[in-house]
């Protein structure tokens, strides 16, 4: 009983004391609305925050990806055989198809404007998810919703 009470108190204190930065709050709003601030903060500490310049290739067609990224701010083009087929913006995942399937990237993704992203290595995420399957489920929901938006956008623009 004492051990359980310890963990309950620790979790409550952890939840209460977490202050997310503006970028972390945006990430939570876009991708992880059901996660508590402490879990979002953990994910953010595990990730690598980067500024990306215009023209930078984030995903190269037919290459294996070792990371999953989210655009916190900025825009990127999704290209298939050099032709723009979709556009990604704030709160959208980069490389989600390759991450989900574990296969090579079916498209290229190139920054069309300066961007701020956060990325996680597949290995770090898989290690984290062993102890936190609830966070993995939330990521799966977010990836599915984002992929649905991307496919719907591509379908509508092809009409």
Task: Label the model's feature ranges.
Residues 5-8, 39, 86-144, 148:
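Cyclic-nucleotide recognition modules
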């Amino acid at each position: 009983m004492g051990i359980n009470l310890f963990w309950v108190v620790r979790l409550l204190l952890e939840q209460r004391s977490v202050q997310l930065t503006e970028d972390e709050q945006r990430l939570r709003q876009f991708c992880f609305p059901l996660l508590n601030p402490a879990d979002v903060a953990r994910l953010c500490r595990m990730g690598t925050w980067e500024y990306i310049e215009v023209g930078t290739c984030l995903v190269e067609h037919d290459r294996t990806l070792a990371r999953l990224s989210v655009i916190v701010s900025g825009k990127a083009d999704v290209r298939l055989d050099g032709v723009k087929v979709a556009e990604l913006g704030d709160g959208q995942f980069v490389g989600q198809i390759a991450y989900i399937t574990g296969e090579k990237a079916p498209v290229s993704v190139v920054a069309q404007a300066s961007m701020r992203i956060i990325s996680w290595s597949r290995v770090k995420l898989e290690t984290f998810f062993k102890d936190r399957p609830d966070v993995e489920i939330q990521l799966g929901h977010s990836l599915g919703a984002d992929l649905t938006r991307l496919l719907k956008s591509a379908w509508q623009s092809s009409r």
